[in-house]
Amino acid sequence: MAQRIKLVPTIGAEIPNLDFTFMLGNNAGESATITDKDIGKAVKIVGDSRVAFCVADDEIHGQLISVEPNQTSGGYKVGTVRAVNSPLFDATLSHATSVAMLDEVVADAQAAIGTPNGTPPYHVRMRVKKAAVANGLRLKVVAFQSGAGATGSNLTVSKIFG
């Protein structure tokens, strides 16, 4: 198969990502188990300045970018989350339903806490699946990095294209 191009900004273009600091986890006990192996997973807002990992069919609010192992706030580990309004995200289709260009996606079940979503180099990708009902507000498939939309395809998803 021919080499695929990757959807990237034009040379010299500055497209900022929207990165924010959040407390991590549904509760302090869960937060204590989060490690750098969880980077790349899809997250949702669950409280005041707090996110937790998405489960199947959740709306994706962002992607975990970093975990501060020695910094806490209110008993929770702290990390950086890239907001879903940032330009582009890498994702892996982990559900049996295929996707096509511009299909909307939601979270699929992420790997267990402390376990990467995949093997390198695909371990920092969100696990996604096709949304059952489109609403025009979700991340959309804008490029296939590998595969053609079947299970295991690596995708580029975005809210600003399509």
State what each model feature region is.
Residues 1-162:
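Surface-exposed, low-hydrophobicity beta-strand/loop segments enriched in small/polar/acidic residues
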